Amino acid sequence: MYRMQLLSCIALSLALVTNSAPTSSSTKKTQLQLEHLLLDLQMILNGINNYKNPKLTRMLTFKFYMPKKATELKHLQCLEEELKPLEEVLNLAQSKNFHLRPRDLISNINVIVLELKGSETTFMCEYADETATIVEFLNRWITFCQSIISTLT
């Protein structure tokens, strides 16, 4: 009598595990993508902070929108929406002392973000009331990446 219910329960559990549970390889891939995203964001931040940038003061006047909360991969939608303004601000910093290639970095970040959040995301980003400077913006997304990576390990 209970045998049929038990078999149904086992079958449903197996279906759930095989279709929705992340595998160790997908977790590892996600972790690697997040590490690449983290490195790109850190590279931009270091490029802004690690030299005498006469344009830094001007760069700090530009404001970026931050999500009210960023705790899941779907929140990367908010980062994606700010990539174009980020590229425009980074283009201001181009000089002989600043050797980052904003277009390449932003393109890399965009590809990684799309892979991590998925292309079919219909998540609408809910932004905080306060805006952030470029340094605050990068630091918050760096912290986001570190936080997600720590949950995967």
Curated annotation (Swiss-Prot):
SUPFAM superfamilies, sorted: 4-helical cytokines (SSF47266)
Main location: secreted
Cited Pfam families: IL2
UniProt keywords, alphabetically: Adaptive immunity, Chromosomal rearrangement, Cytokine, Disulfide bond, Glycoprotein, Growth factor, Immunity, Pharmaceutical, Proto-oncogene, Secreted, Signal
Cysteine-cysteine disulfides: 78-125
Signal peptide positions (record): 1-20
Coiled coil: none
Gene Ontology CC, one term: extracellular space
Superkingdom assignment: Eukaryota
UniProt GO BP: activated T cell proliferation; adaptive immune response; cell adhesion; cell surface receptor signaling pathway via STAT; cell-cell signaling; extrinsic apoptotic signaling pathway in absence of ligand; immune response; interleukin-2-mediated signaling pathway
Sites where a glycan is attached: 23
Subcellular location(s) of the protein: Secreted
GO molecular function: carbohydrate binding; cytokine activity; glycosphingolipid binding; growth factor activity; interleukin-2 receptor binding; kappa-type opioid receptor binding; kinase activator activity
Disease as annotated in the protein's UniProt record: A chromosomal aberration involving IL2 is found in a form of T-cell acute lymphoblastic leukemia (T-ALL). Translocation t(4;16)(q26;p13) with involves TNFRSF17.
Function: Cytokine produced by activated CD4-positive helper T-cells and to a lesser extend activated CD8-positive T-cells and natural killer (NK) cells that plays pivotal roles in the immune response and tolerance. Binds to a receptor complex composed of either the high-affinity trimeric IL-2R (IL2RA/CD25, IL2RB/CD122 and IL2RG/CD132) or the low-affinity dimeric IL-2R (IL2RB and IL2RG). Interaction with the receptor leads to oligomerization and conformation changes in the IL-2R subunits resulting in downstream signaling starting with phosphorylation of JAK1 and JAK3.
Homology family: Belongs to the IL-2 family.
Descriptive protein name: Interleukin-2
Gene name per UniProt: IL2
